[in-house]
Design a protein with these regions (language model features):
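Conserved ABC ATPase signature
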Residues: 123-127, 131-133
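ABC ATPase NBD coupling module
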Residues: 61-79
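Conserved ABC ATPase "signature" region
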Residues: 62, 104-119, 170-171
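A short, proline-enriched helix->beta-strand linker immediately N-terminal to the Walker B motif
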Residues: 142-146
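Conserved H-loop
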Residues: 177-183
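Hydrophobic anchor residue at the start of the ABC signature
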Residues: 137
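Catalytic Walker B motif of ABC-type/P-loop ATPase nucleotide-binding domains
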Residues: 148-152
Length: 209
């Protein structure tokens, strides 16, 4: 389980969070600029908290008081950023295996489960928006992460694609049984995908079951 108690001060917002992340899918909502992305970047190791700590089970990832800092590549976190999420000139296979922290068998499993086997050698930039989302999810899952962090995973899709891709993502996340934080500003996704709903308002994360 991920437990955390930290503050991160940034020019745009100060984020304060204190709690634990259980299994299942946690949907984190809030207005643009409220601190949602900063929160998951702290968990991922992409942003350093100003004060506080983050633990995974018995392992301390961050303790600012004790000057402990485990870098992102050693946390085994799957992170799917918002926006441009594939390397367009690399093949689908190379996109998924980019971190080099998984195995060929894992790549084969993901290609099959994500419906991407026939695109293995295809450049990712030539795929549809929904297919690119699946490639990005495959890359995030490739290292068998202890936690999956998705930042607005459906924002790049038009409304016609969102429902199907959302159902596919949720199905795979539950099948792999990996704790997930799903960041969105779309309130309709709360009931559609989440086991619980957290709210980020002016940098304060409100934890609820």
């Amino acid at each position: 389980m991920i437990t955390f108690s930290f503050t991160v001060a940034r020019p745009s917002v100060t984020v304060k969070a204190d709690g634990a992340l259980p299994s299942g899918i946690t949907v984190l909502t809030g207005q643009s600029g409220s601190g949602k992305s900063t929160f998951i970047k702290c968990i991922a190791g992409l942003v350093k908290p100003t004060t506080g700590s983050i633990q995974y089970n018995e392992t301390t990832w961050v303790d600012r008081g004790k000057k402990i800092w485990v870098p992102a590549q050693k946390r085994q976190v799957g992170y799917m950023p918002q926006g441009n999420i594939v390397f367009p000139h690399l093949s689908v296979e190379h996109n998924i295996t980019y971190s080099k922290r998984g195995t060929p068998d894992m790549c084969n499993t993901l290609l099959q489960r994500l419906g991407l086997e026939k695109y293995r050698k295809t450049k990712a930039g030539s795929l549809s928006g929904g297919e690119q989302q699946r490639v990005a999810l495959g890359r995030a899952l490739y290292s068998k992460p202890t936690i999956l962090l998705l930042d607005e995973p459906l924002s790049a899709l038009d409304w016609n694609l969102r429902k199907q891709v959302r159902e596919d993502l949720v199905s795979i996340i539950r099948e792999w049984d990996v704790p997930c934080v799903w960041v969105t500003h779309d309130e309709s996704e709360v009931e559609a995908v989440g086991d619980r709903h957290w709210i980020c308002e002016n940098g304060l994360i409100t934890i609820s079951e």
